[in-house]
Amino acid sequence: MGVAGSGVLYFLFNNVPSPRFWLKKTQLIGTENPEGITGYECPYEYLRKSYGKHHWAAFVDKLSPNLQNEDPAKYRMVLETMDVIHLCLMMVDDISDGSEYRKGKPAAHKIYGAPETANRAYYRVTQILAQTATEFPRLSPWLMTDLRDILEGQDMSLVWRRDGVNGFPGTASERTAAYKRMVLLKTGGLFRLLGHLTLENNSMDEAFSTLGWHSQLQNDCKNVYSSEYAKMKGVVAEDLLNREMTYPIVLALDASGGHWVEAALKSPSRRNVGNALKIIQCDYVRDVCMAELARSGAPVKEWLKLWKREEKLDLKA
Protein backbone atom coordinates (compact mmCIF):
# COMPACT_ATOMS: atom_id res chain seq x y z
CA MET A 1 0.00 0.00 0.00
CA GLY A 2 1.34 3.42 -0.93
CA VAL A 3 1.98 6.36 1.36
CA ALA A 4 -1.23 8.03 0.20
CA GLY A 5 -3.28 4.93 0.99
CA SER A 6 -1.72 4.61 4.43
CA GLY A 7 -2.46 8.26 5.11
CA VAL A 8 -6.12 7.82 4.21
CA LEU A 9 -6.44 4.80 6.52
CA TYR A 10 -4.72 6.69 9.36
CA PHE A 11 -7.10 9.62 8.93
CA LEU A 12 -10.20 7.41 8.88
CA PHE A 13 -9.07 5.37 11.90
CA ASN A 14 -8.40 8.41 14.06
CA ASN A 15 -11.08 10.84 12.93
CA VAL A 16 -14.18 8.87 11.99
CA PRO A 17 -16.47 7.91 14.93
CA SER A 18 -16.03 4.27 15.84
CA PRO A 19 -18.81 1.86 14.87
CA ARG A 20 -20.22 0.53 18.12
CA PHE A 21 -19.88 -3.10 17.02
CA TRP A 22 -16.09 -2.69 17.35
CA LEU A 23 -16.60 -2.33 21.09
CA LYS A 24 -18.28 -5.71 21.56
CA LYS A 25 -16.33 -8.44 23.28
CA THR A 26 -18.44 -11.00 21.44
CA GLN A 27 -21.16 -10.98 18.84
CA LEU A 28 -24.28 -11.75 20.84
CA ILE A 29 -26.99 -13.99 19.47
CA GLY A 30 -30.55 -13.45 20.66
CA THR A 31 -31.98 -16.17 22.89
CA GLU A 32 -34.57 -18.34 21.16
CA ASN A 33 -37.94 -18.67 22.88
CA PRO A 34 -37.00 -16.31 25.74
CA GLU A 35 -40.43 -16.73 27.31
CA GLY A 36 -39.43 -20.26 28.23
CA ILE A 37 -36.34 -19.04 30.04
CA THR A 38 -37.26 -15.91 31.96
CA GLY A 39 -41.04 -15.94 32.02
CA TYR A 40 -43.69 -13.66 30.63
CA GLU A 41 -41.81 -10.44 31.39
CA CYS A 42 -38.62 -11.68 29.80
CA PRO A 43 -36.44 -8.52 29.36
CA TYR A 44 -37.58 -7.13 32.71
CA GLU A 45 -37.10 -10.37 34.62
CA TYR A 46 -33.75 -10.89 32.91
CA LEU A 47 -32.47 -7.58 34.29
CA ARG A 48 -34.06 -8.14 37.69
CA LYS A 49 -32.04 -11.33 38.09
CA SER A 50 -28.87 -9.21 38.00
CA TYR A 51 -30.06 -6.82 40.71
CA GLY A 52 -32.20 -9.18 42.76
CA LYS A 53 -35.93 -9.01 43.40
CA HIS A 54 -36.89 -6.13 45.71
CA HIS A 55 -33.34 -4.77 45.74
CA TRP A 56 -34.48 -1.64 47.64
CA ALA A 57 -35.59 -3.66 50.68
CA ALA A 58 -32.68 -2.54 52.88
CA PHE A 59 -33.64 1.10 52.30
CA VAL A 60 -37.31 0.52 53.08
CA ASP A 61 -36.41 -1.43 56.22
CA LYS A 62 -34.21 1.42 57.43
CA LEU A 63 -36.86 4.04 56.66
CA SER A 64 -39.72 2.12 58.27
CA PRO A 65 -38.51 -0.88 60.32
CA ASN A 66 -42.04 -2.05 61.16
CA LEU A 67 -43.70 -1.62 57.78
CA GLN A 68 -43.27 -5.24 56.70
CA ASN A 69 -45.17 -6.49 59.76
CA GLU A 70 -47.67 -3.66 60.13
CA ASP A 71 -48.68 -3.36 56.47
CA PRO A 72 -47.22 -6.22 54.41
CA ALA A 73 -49.32 -5.35 51.35
CA LYS A 74 -47.94 -1.81 51.21
CA TYR A 75 -44.43 -3.10 51.91
CA ARG A 76 -44.61 -5.37 48.87
CA MET A 77 -46.16 -2.62 46.78
CA VAL A 78 -43.38 -0.15 47.60
CA LEU A 79 -40.68 -2.69 46.77
CA GLU A 80 -42.35 -3.79 43.55
CA THR A 81 -42.84 -0.19 42.46
CA MET A 82 -39.21 0.71 43.13
CA ASP A 83 -38.06 -2.36 41.19
CA VAL A 84 -40.25 -1.47 38.22
CA ILE A 85 -39.36 2.22 38.00
CA HIS A 86 -35.63 1.70 38.57
CA LEU A 87 -35.15 -1.30 36.29
CA CYS A 88 -37.39 -0.08 33.48
CA LEU A 89 -35.55 3.24 33.39
CA MET A 90 -32.29 1.31 33.06
CA MET A 91 -33.71 -0.84 30.26
CA VAL A 92 -34.58 2.26 28.23
CA ASP A 93 -31.31 4.00 29.20
CA ASP A 94 -29.30 1.08 27.87
CA ILE A 95 -31.14 1.27 24.57
CA SER A 96 -30.55 5.04 24.34
CA ASP A 97 -26.87 4.59 25.18
CA GLY A 98 -26.33 1.62 22.88
CA SER A 99 -24.88 -0.18 25.90
CA GLU A 100 -23.45 -3.62 25.28
CA TYR A 101 -23.40 -4.70 28.93
CA ARG A 102 -25.13 -4.08 32.25
CA LYS A 103 -23.40 -5.33 35.40
CA GLY A 104 -21.02 -7.40 33.28
CA LYS A 105 -23.81 -9.21 31.40
CA PRO A 106 -25.31 -8.50 27.98
CA ALA A 107 -27.81 -5.65 28.20
CA ALA A 108 -31.43 -6.78 27.88
CA HIS A 109 -31.92 -5.23 24.43
CA LYS A 110 -28.89 -7.10 23.09
CA ILE A 111 -30.77 -10.35 23.76
CA TYR A 112 -34.43 -9.47 23.28
CA GLY A 113 -34.07 -6.57 20.86
CA ALA A 114 -34.72 -2.87 21.42
CA PRO A 115 -38.43 -2.88 20.43
CA GLU A 116 -39.43 -5.66 22.82
CA THR A 117 -37.25 -4.33 25.64
CA ALA A 118 -38.58 -0.77 25.35
CA ASN A 119 -42.18 -1.90 25.07
CA ARG A 120 -41.80 -4.20 28.06
CA ALA A 121 -40.43 -1.31 30.11
CA TYR A 122 -43.38 0.93 29.19
CA TYR A 123 -45.82 -1.91 29.82
CA ARG A 124 -44.46 -2.67 33.28
CA VAL A 125 -44.52 1.01 34.26
CA THR A 126 -48.12 1.27 33.05
CA GLN A 127 -49.02 -1.84 35.02
CA ILE A 128 -47.56 -0.48 38.24
CA LEU A 129 -49.26 2.90 37.77
CA ALA A 130 -52.62 1.18 37.34
CA GLN A 131 -52.03 -1.16 40.27
CA THR A 132 -51.04 1.71 42.55
CA ALA A 133 -54.11 3.73 41.58
CA THR A 134 -56.37 0.77 42.33
CA GLU A 135 -54.80 -0.70 45.46
CA PHE A 136 -53.03 2.29 47.04
CA PRO A 137 -54.59 5.46 45.57
CA ARG A 138 -53.00 7.64 48.25
CA LEU A 139 -49.58 6.73 46.82
CA SER A 140 -50.48 7.66 43.24
CA PRO A 141 -49.79 11.42 43.54
CA TRP A 142 -46.31 10.73 44.91
CA LEU A 143 -45.58 8.21 42.17
CA MET A 144 -46.84 10.42 39.34
CA THR A 145 -45.01 13.54 40.56
CA ASP A 146 -41.68 11.78 41.05
CA LEU A 147 -41.94 9.88 37.78
CA ARG A 148 -42.59 13.19 36.01
CA ASP A 149 -39.44 14.65 37.62
CA ILE A 150 -37.37 11.63 36.64
CA LEU A 151 -38.48 11.81 33.02
CA GLU A 152 -38.03 15.60 32.90
CA GLY A 153 -34.43 15.16 34.03
CA GLN A 154 -33.88 12.39 31.51
CA ASP A 155 -35.34 14.60 28.79
CA MET A 156 -32.90 17.40 29.66
CA SER A 157 -30.01 14.96 29.35
CA LEU A 158 -31.20 13.68 25.97
CA VAL A 159 -31.69 17.19 24.59
CA TRP A 160 -28.13 18.08 25.59
CA ARG A 161 -26.91 14.94 23.86
CA ARG A 162 -28.80 15.91 20.71
CA ASP A 163 -27.75 19.57 20.66
CA GLY A 164 -24.25 19.17 22.07
CA VAL A 165 -22.30 22.03 23.61
CA ASN A 166 -24.28 24.58 21.60
CA GLY A 167 -27.38 23.69 23.60
CA PHE A 168 -25.58 23.79 26.94
CA PRO A 169 -25.06 26.92 29.12
CA GLY A 170 -21.99 28.99 28.30
CA THR A 171 -20.20 29.65 31.60
CA ALA A 172 -18.66 27.13 33.98
CA SER A 173 -20.96 28.02 36.88
CA GLU A 174 -24.06 27.89 34.68
CA ARG A 175 -23.03 24.53 33.29
CA THR A 176 -22.49 23.02 36.71
CA ALA A 177 -25.79 24.40 38.00
CA ALA A 178 -27.71 23.12 34.97
CA TYR A 179 -26.15 19.68 35.26
CA LYS A 180 -26.93 19.44 38.96
CA ARG A 181 -30.54 20.47 38.37
CA MET A 182 -30.88 17.68 35.81
CA VAL A 183 -29.41 15.13 38.23
CA LEU A 184 -31.65 16.24 41.10
CA LEU A 185 -34.64 15.63 38.84
CA LYS A 186 -33.55 12.37 37.22
CA THR A 187 -31.61 10.53 39.92
CA GLY A 188 -32.76 12.51 42.94
CA GLY A 189 -36.34 11.87 41.87
CA LEU A 190 -35.82 8.11 42.11
CA PHE A 191 -34.53 8.32 45.67
CA ARG A 192 -37.22 10.81 46.70
CA LEU A 193 -39.81 8.39 45.31
CA LEU A 194 -38.54 5.78 47.76
CA GLY A 195 -39.08 8.14 50.70
CA HIS A 196 -42.45 9.34 49.46
CA LEU A 197 -43.88 5.85 48.92
CA THR A 198 -42.56 4.49 52.21
CA LEU A 199 -43.29 7.42 54.55
CA GLU A 200 -45.98 9.28 52.57
CA ASN A 201 -44.32 12.60 53.38
CA ASN A 202 -41.36 14.66 52.17
CA SER A 203 -39.25 14.47 55.33
CA MET A 204 -36.42 12.68 53.49
CA ASP A 205 -36.35 14.93 50.42
CA GLU A 206 -33.16 16.81 51.30
CA ALA A 207 -31.21 13.71 52.33
CA PHE A 208 -32.38 11.65 49.36
CA SER A 209 -31.72 14.48 46.90
CA THR A 210 -28.15 14.53 48.22
CA LEU A 211 -27.99 10.75 47.95
CA GLY A 212 -29.21 10.95 44.36
CA TRP A 213 -26.59 13.58 43.50
CA HIS A 214 -23.84 11.49 45.08
CA SER A 215 -25.04 8.33 43.35
CA GLN A 216 -24.96 10.05 39.95
CA LEU A 217 -21.48 11.39 40.69
CA GLN A 218 -20.37 7.84 41.42
CA ASN A 219 -21.74 6.66 38.09
CA ASP A 220 -20.19 9.58 36.23
CA CYS A 221 -16.78 9.02 37.80
CA LYS A 222 -16.81 5.24 37.37
CA ASN A 223 -17.46 5.77 33.67
CA VAL A 224 -14.07 7.44 33.20
CA TYR A 225 -12.01 6.53 36.28
CA SER A 226 -12.80 2.85 37.03
CA SER A 227 -11.11 -0.02 35.18
CA GLU A 228 -13.47 -2.47 36.91
CA TYR A 229 -16.53 -0.58 35.67
CA ALA A 230 -15.05 -0.33 32.17
CA LYS A 231 -14.58 -4.09 32.15
CA MET A 232 -18.23 -4.65 33.12
CA LYS A 233 -19.47 -2.20 30.47
CA GLY A 234 -17.04 -3.38 27.81
CA VAL A 235 -15.75 0.14 27.11
CA VAL A 236 -14.10 3.12 28.82
CA ALA A 237 -15.91 6.48 28.73
CA GLU A 238 -19.18 5.21 27.27
CA ASP A 239 -20.81 8.54 28.21
CA LEU A 240 -18.30 10.49 26.12
CA LEU A 241 -18.79 8.14 23.16
CA ASN A 242 -22.53 8.81 23.47
CA ARG A 243 -21.94 12.59 23.58
CA GLU A 244 -23.56 12.67 27.01
CA MET A 245 -22.96 15.33 29.66
CA THR A 246 -21.57 14.10 32.97
CA TYR A 247 -19.94 15.89 35.90
CA PRO A 248 -16.33 15.12 34.83
CA ILE A 249 -17.14 16.11 31.25
CA VAL A 250 -18.79 19.36 32.35
CA LEU A 251 -15.72 20.24 34.43
CA ALA A 252 -13.33 19.24 31.66
CA LEU A 253 -14.99 21.61 29.19
CA ASP A 254 -13.46 24.50 31.13
CA ALA A 255 -10.13 22.86 31.94
CA SER A 256 -6.94 23.43 29.99
CA GLY A 257 -7.36 21.57 26.72
CA GLY A 258 -11.14 21.61 27.08
CA HIS A 259 -11.49 22.20 23.35
CA TRP A 260 -10.74 18.49 22.90
CA VAL A 261 -13.72 17.62 25.09
CA GLU A 262 -15.92 19.92 23.03
CA ALA A 263 -14.58 18.32 19.85
CA ALA A 264 -15.36 14.81 21.17
CA LEU A 265 -18.91 15.85 22.06
CA LYS A 266 -19.36 17.10 18.50
CA SER A 267 -17.66 14.14 16.83
CA PRO A 268 -16.60 11.17 19.02
CA SER A 269 -13.78 9.98 16.76
CA ARG A 270 -10.94 7.93 18.24
CA ARG A 271 -8.60 10.91 18.07
CA ASN A 272 -11.05 13.32 19.69
CA VAL A 273 -12.13 10.87 22.39
CA GLY A 274 -8.55 9.88 23.18
CA ASN A 275 -7.45 13.49 23.62
CA ALA A 276 -10.61 14.41 25.52
CA LEU A 277 -10.12 11.50 27.90
CA LYS A 278 -6.68 12.83 28.81
CA ILE A 279 -8.31 16.10 29.90
CA ILE A 280 -11.13 14.36 31.77
CA GLN A 281 -8.63 12.13 33.60
CA CYS A 282 -6.18 14.94 34.40
CA ASP A 283 -5.37 15.69 38.03
CA TYR A 284 -7.39 18.91 38.16
CA VAL A 285 -10.70 17.44 36.94
CA ARG A 286 -10.21 14.22 38.87
CA ASP A 287 -9.39 16.08 42.12
CA VAL A 288 -12.50 18.27 41.84
CA CYS A 289 -14.63 15.17 41.26
CA MET A 290 -13.12 13.33 44.22
CA ALA A 291 -13.63 16.37 46.46
CA GLU A 292 -17.30 16.62 45.45
CA LEU A 293 -17.78 12.90 46.04
CA ALA A 294 -16.35 13.28 49.55
CA ARG A 295 -18.40 16.40 50.28
CA SER A 296 -21.72 15.02 49.04
CA GLY A 297 -21.18 11.60 50.59
CA ALA A 298 -20.45 12.81 54.12
CA PRO A 299 -24.04 13.60 55.20
CA VAL A 300 -25.49 10.39 53.70
CA LYS A 301 -22.78 7.87 54.58
CA GLU A 302 -25.20 5.61 56.47
CA TRP A 303 -27.34 5.30 53.36
CA LEU A 304 -24.30 4.72 51.18
CA LYS A 305 -23.46 1.63 53.21
CA LEU A 306 -26.75 0.16 51.99
CA TRP A 307 -26.03 1.17 48.40
CA LYS A 308 -22.80 -0.90 48.37
CA ARG A 309 -21.02 0.69 45.44
CA GLU A 310 -17.30 0.29 45.88
CA GLU A 311 -15.63 0.16 42.45
CA LYS A 312 -12.08 1.53 42.61
CA LEU A 313 -11.52 4.80 40.76
CA ASP A 314 -8.06 3.86 39.52
CA LEU A 315 -7.81 5.31 36.00
CA LYS A 316 -5.75 8.46 35.42
CA ALA A 317 -4.37 10.34 32.44
From Swiss-Prot:
| Swiss-Prot/TrEMBL keywords | Magnesium, Metal-binding, Transferase
Where along this sequence does the record place binding of substrate? K53, H86, R102, K186, T187, Q216, N223, K233
Instruction: Give GO MF terms, alphabetically.
Output: metal ion binding; prenyltransferase activity
What InterPro entries does the database record attribute to this sequence?
Isoprenoid_synthase_dom_sf, Polyprenyl_synt
Q: Which residues bind Mg(2+) 2?
A: D93, D97
Q: When the coding gene is removed by deletion, what phenotypic consequences does the entry describe? A: Impairs the production of paxilline.
- What is its EC class? transferase
Residue positions binding Mg(2+) 1: D93, D97
Report any one BP term from Gene Ontology.
paxilline biosynthetic process
Its EC number is: 2.5.1.-
Pathway named in the protein's UniProt entry: Secondary metabolite biosynthesis
Instruction: Name the protein family.
Output: Belongs to the FPP/GGPP synthase family.
Query: What role does it play?
Result: Prenyl transferase; part of the gene cluster that mediates the biosynthesis of paxalline, a mycotoxin that acts as an inhibitor of mammalian maxi-K channels. PaxG, the geranylgeranyl diphosphate (GGPP) synthase is proposed to catalyze the first step in paxilline biosynthesis. Condensation of indole-3-glycerol phosphate with GGPP by paxC then forms 3-geranylgeranylindole (3-GGI), followed by epoxidation and cyclization of this intermediate (by paxM and paxB) to form paspaline.
What is the designated name of this protein? Answer: Prenyl transferase paxC
Q: Which organism is it from?
A: Penicillium paxilli
